[in-house]
Amino acid sequence: MSDDIFLVTGGAGYIGSHTVIELINHGIKVVIADNLSNSSYDAVARIEFIVKQHVSHFIKVDIRNEKELNQVFSNHKISGVIHFAALKAVGESTKIPLEYYDNNVSGTIALLNVCKSNNVKTIVFSSSATVYGDVTRFGDNSMIPIPEHCPME
């Protein structure tokens, strides 16, 4: 078993909670950070039921709050981050784009600042295929997989 401790942001969300289960099942120590705006503490209870052990480190925190996030890093000696924390509803994002920008972009920047100040150099960033747009609009498979020269919409 490794002494590394991974922070999973958005760890109470769907993908985050499944990732936490796999990490725990592989003997990796995990700290879950989630502001519960898109999820529920019930997910942590389900994780505990599945892995048959108590999840000792769940922290309700907004990743935009660098002071609180720094405290998480120093209290738990975080060695790597798997970053899932984000607002994700595409339709809603077109109605309130600044809130999405603040949460998703500013939150990621704050997280990266905290990683840097704590000398954490391992981060896995997750996003959505929707950021690439619809490449099927070209009417053939010339843009699948998406090449770097693919035109932006």
From Swiss-Prot:
Cofactor names from the entry are: NAD(+)
InterPro entries on file: Epimerase_deHydtase (IPR001509), NAD(P)-bd_dom_sf (IPR036291)
Query: Which GO MF term does the entry hold, naming one?
Result: UDP-glucose 4-epimerase activity
Enzyme Commission code: 5.1.3.2, 5.1.3.3
Q: Which cysteines are joined by disulfide bonds?
A: none
Q: Does this entry carry the keyword Isomerase?
A: yes
GO cellular component annotations of the record = cytosol
Q: Which reaction does it catalyse?
A: UDP-alpha-D-glucose = UDP-alpha-D-galactose; alpha-D-glucose = beta-D-glucose
Using the record, list the residue span of the signal peptide; answer none if the entry has no such feature.
none
Q: Which UniProt keywords apply?
A: Carbohydrate metabolism, Galactose metabolism, Isomerase, Multifunctional enzyme, NAD
Q: Does the keyword Isomerase apply?
A: yes
Q: Where is this region: Galactowaldenase?
A: 1-153
Transmembrane stretches in the record are: none
Pathway field? Carbohydrate metabolism; galactose metabolism; Carbohydrate metabolism; hexose metabolism
User: A Gene Ontology biological process annotation?
Assistant: galactose metabolic process
What family does the Swiss-Prot or TrEMBL record give for this protein?
In the N-terminal section; belongs to the NAD(P)-dependent epimerase/dehydratase family. In the C-terminal section; belongs to the aldose epimerase family.
Described function: Mutarotase converts alpha-aldose to the beta-anomer. It is active on D-glucose, L-arabinose, D-xylose, D-galactose, maltose and lactose.
This protein is called: Bifunctional protein GAL10
Q: Which organism is it from?
A: Candida maltosa (Yeast)
